[in-house]
């Protein structure tokens, strides 16, 4: 419960409310896009590679993208300027540390 409150508080610090989050699928390749125009750095971690941090790429509109993900089930979260961020995702799953991760389910 306390960890959940901390995550909610961090969301407020990052941008006032949860950033918009979009999933795009092209030819079975998944791209996740996070709208966080004021962020300096965004990293992505997923269960695909044991939550190894990988940098997201920022475009001119402040959207951060992580491309080339397989269209398979996985859990994930972002680090925005060093702070854990769960966007407003459709599915969430409890992690092993008392918090939660977003969960992607193939379409």
Task: Outline where the language-model segments fall.
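C-terminal motif of bacterial Sec signal peptides marking the signal peptidase cleavage site
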Residues: 13-16
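Sec-dependent signal peptide recognition
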Residues: 1-8
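Bacterial signal peptide processing site
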Residues: 18-20
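Aromatic-rich carbohydrate-binding modules that target alpha-glucans
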Residues: 23-73, 81-107
